[in-house]
UniProtKB/Swiss-Prot annotation:
Compartments in which it is found: Cell membrane
Range of residues in the leader sequence: none
Classification via InterPro entries: ATP_synth_F0_csu (IPR000454), ATP_synth_F0_csu_DDCD_BS (IPR020537), ATPase_proteolipid_c-like_dom (IPR002379), F/V-ATP_Csub_sf (IPR035921)
Lineage of the species this protein comes from: Bacteria, Bacillati, Mycoplasmatota, Mycoplasmoidales, Mycoplasmoidaceae
Organism field: Mycoplasmoides gallisepticum (strain R(low / passage 15 / clone 2)) (Mycoplasma gallisepticum)
Gene3D superfamilies, alphabetized: lithium bound rotor ring of v- atpase
Gene symbol of the encoding locus: atpE
Keyword set includes Ion transport: yes
Subunit and interaction comment: F-type ATPases have 2 components, F(1) - the catalytic core - and F(0) - the membrane proton channel. F(1) has five subunits: alpha(3), beta(3), gamma(1), delta(1), epsilon(1). F(0) has three main subunits: a(1), b(2) and c(10-14). The alpha and beta chains form an alternating ring which encloses part of the gamma chain. F(1) is attached to F(0) by a central stalk formed by the gamma and epsilon chains, while a peripheral stalk is formed by the delta and b chains.
Name of the protein this chain belongs to: ATP synthase subunit c
Membrane topology term: Multi-pass membrane protein
């Protein structure tokens, strides 16, 4: 009778360890997926900056208008990267 209680306790402990390990792995995978936002933002921002530089080379007199849209667009793009970073930090440090 006691051996069954010991086996039951061992199974419960092993099950708790696997759940904890699964939670950590899931949190790290989720954090990595959230940080792919930064890669996408970098590509998009580089593309937009290149087009702004091309527009300024063609029409230098439009500097104030292009610069305004360039800065606002960069700020909007960076906000999504910052949100991805915050989500990654929450998953890594809070979801334990």
């Amino acid at each position: 009778m006691n051996i069954f209680l010991v086996i039951h306790e061992l199974i419960n402990q092993a099950d708790q360890v696997n759940v904890t390990l699964t939670n950590h792995v899931g949190a790290y995978i989720g954090a990595g997926m959230a940080m792919t936002a930064a890669a996408g933002v970098g590509v998009g921002q580089g593309f937009a900056s290149g087009l702004c530089a091309t527009a300024l080379a063609r029409n230098p007199e439009l500097l104030p208008k292009i610069q305004l849209f360039w800065i606002v667009g960069s700020a909007i793009a960076e906000s999504s990267a910052i949100y991805g970073l915050i989500i990654a930090f929450i998953l890594i440090f809070v979801a334990r």
